Amino acid sequence: MKRQLYQFIFFRLLGWKIKGTIPNELKKCVMMVMPHTSNYDFFLGLFTRGILNQEMNFVGKKELFIFPFGYYFKSIGGAPIDRSGGKNVVDAIVDIFNSRTVFRLAIAPEGTRKKVTELKTGFYYIALKANVPIVPVAFDYGTKEVRIGNPVKINGDYDSDMNQLLLPHFANVKGRIPENQFND
């Protein structure tokens, strides 16, 4: 019932489409979601998660996951980051990957909704350390499409992987606020 409601709102009322999917057998990955220019992007992600009926996750500091909001955040795929013991964010997230059988982490490499000239690299190193592929996901407001690319197994050469395998997926994609989106 909930899935049909998501489909009705997303496809019929809002006029969006989903191109591609995450293979069901792919239980762990980092989803590189771009461009991130608006708070609406989070809701596009929630609709996509509900329509595809697949576990998709995000992370937040553990303080967000206490009563009364903790249950809600976990129910929509949230996972608390525990940075105790001086652990950095990348290692804390890799620990989450290692502790779960299904974890598809959505991350916006811009790290903000404002204009950036360089992407954050944490998503890449999370995938590398957790030994999981990166799935490029584009939110194209110009065509009203969520485009899910094929999983990419990275090799540790950040520049090569980004320029040859990942960034081409985002060519000609238009964010909700285009002047804020990353352009390489």
Which stretches of residues belong to each language-model region?
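Short acidic-hydrophobic, aromatic-tinged amphipathic segments that line or gate anion-handling sites
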Residues: 18, 79-84, 153-155
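Catalytic core of membrane glycerolipid acyltransferases/transacylases, capturing the structured
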Residues: 24-84, 141
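Non-catalytic C-terminal accessory region of glycerolipid acyltransferases
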Residues: 86-184
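Short, glycine/polar-rich helix-capping loops at beta-to-alpha or helix-loop-helix junctions
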Residues: 3-6, 65-69, 136-137
